[in-house]
Amino acid sequence: KPEYDNKERLKDFRIDNDATILITGNGLNGKKADTLELYTRAAEIEAAIFGNTVHVTTGANVIDANTGKVTAIEGKGKKPEIAIDVKDLGGMYAGRIFLIGNEKGLPIDIKGAIESQHMVLDNQGNLYHAGTTHSMEDMTIHAKDIRNTGTMASSRHMTLQADGQITNDKTIGSVGNMAITANQVTNHKTIASEKDLSITTTSEEENAL
């Protein structure tokens, strides 16, 4: 809900209930706006979202209306099981895409397609990626654990960072540089870069590359 200061100016947006935004049917076309911003406890995407710049911010949060700063708060009601759930028939198509999961422990699950010029994904829970995600420019992804059984590709640079493990069972690729940082990396299929490839692990356990 929107909150206002004592001069009745929009101050911030407070998301503390258990509501979920559901995108279904013919999807959501935000191309007439410069920026499409979705603030919700959780998002379920069963159809396509189109836009120029798309922000999806989930979790129990207060979002500053002027700066966009996201501050986690205590949520009410039933805690969702998934922060952002992109179904098989769901997808996002935009110049710039920002997917922010700010509630600890909630995963992002991507089974559909995401196409962008520039993409940022930052989640406080795990990322389960079984779909196809492609960025024409830079792609930056951070999550607790990352499990890829789909295709993640960047036509420029890619940065993958996990607080725990990165497990790849299909394809992760970039035309530009790729930097991977995790406690442990397990690769069963293809991790490839046409330029520099850097893999940094912090665990003393053996990594399977």
Where does each model-flagged region fall?
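Extracellular and secretory-pathway beta-repeat/beta-biased strand scaffolds
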Residues: K1-L209
